């Protein structure tokens, strides 16, 4: 048996301002840091001992990872940071206020961009040139993604980096983002394209899965429930 714990980063500045974030590299708020400490204590109380931690290339997730590991007194754990665990790329919506986008594009269209599994947001003209992505082939860097595309981006990392550890009986910790974790939950629980709309992970919330030797889910649950509004459910 092995356990997987997945954690969504604490509240970011963009969550606070109600703006689309995606691959924008925004900081945690004071509340977000507090949420990270709280979920770290929740995980410690549950008694998990991890072999590896996985996170994205975005500092809101990286810092949450470090705070959680500090609370666990496991700062020496091996950590892998991967662009494949980045948040879903919101394309040209990045940086826009969510209320403003409803006014410009309409409530129905914005809801479709946010919640549909296959809907694409308006794309950026160019993909990211940030130095952190220098090892990622230009053709692999998105200019905007549907949740389906973000899931396909995530899958190779899950299969190649996380699953082998679980199959070896080693507990794994993933600290990532709202949409990334929804995609992972969809894969683990085999949720339909339609039903994934109702799945949420709050800022500073941890979910756990206990797997059998064949990666069958034996047990699952939520360790901590953050407090957030509907506007904070992504990014």
UniProtKB/Swiss-Prot annotation:
Disulfide bond annotation, renumbered to this chain: none
Protein family (similarity comment): Belongs to the phosphoglycerate mutase family. BPG-dependent PGAM subfamily.
PANTHER family: PHOSPHOGLYCERATE MUTASE
SMART domains, per the entry: PGAM
Marked site (Transition state stabilizer) residue numbers: 177
Residues that hold substrate according to the record: 8-15, 21-22, 60, 87-90, 98, 114-115
One of the GO biological process terms: glycolytic process
A molecular function GO annotation: phosphoglycerate mutase activity
UniProt name for this protein: 2,3-bisphosphoglycerate-dependent phosphoglycerate mutase 1
EC number(s) from the headed UniProt entry: 5.4.2.11
UniProt keywords, alphabetically: Gluconeogenesis, Glycolysis, Isomerase
Catalytic activity as recorded in UniProt: (2R)-2-phosphoglycerate = (2R)-3-phosphoglycerate
């Amino acid at each position: 048996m092995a356990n997987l714990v997945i954690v969504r980063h604490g509240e970011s500045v963009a969550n606070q301002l109600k703006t689309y974030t995606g691959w924008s590299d925004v900081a945690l708020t004071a509340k977000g840091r507090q949420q990270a400490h709280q979920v770290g204590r929740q995980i410690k109380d549950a008694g998990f001992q991890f072999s590896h931690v996985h996170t994205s290339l975005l500092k809101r997730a990286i810092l949450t990872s470090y705070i959680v590991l500090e609370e666990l007194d496991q700062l020496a754990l091996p950590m892998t940071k991967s662009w494949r665990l980045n948040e879903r790329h919101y394309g040209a919506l990045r940086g826009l206020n969510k209320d403003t986008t409803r006014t410009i594009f309409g409530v129905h269209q914005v809801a479709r961009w946010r919640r549909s599994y296959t809907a694409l947001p308006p794309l950026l003209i160019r993909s990211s040139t940030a130095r952190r992505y220098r090892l990622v082939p230009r053709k692999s860097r998105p200019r905007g993604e549907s949740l389906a595309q973000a899931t396909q981006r995530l899958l190779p990392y899950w299969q190649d980096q996380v699953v082998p550890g679980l199959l070896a009986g080693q507990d794994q910790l993933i600290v990532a983002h709202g949409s990334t974790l929804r995609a992972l939950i969809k894969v683990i629980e085999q949720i339909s394209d339609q039903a994934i709309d109702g799945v949420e992970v709050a800022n500073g919330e941890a979910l756990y899965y206990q797997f059998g030797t064949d990666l069958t889910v034996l047990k699952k649950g939520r360790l901590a429930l953050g407090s957030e509004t509907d506007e904070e459910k992504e990014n």
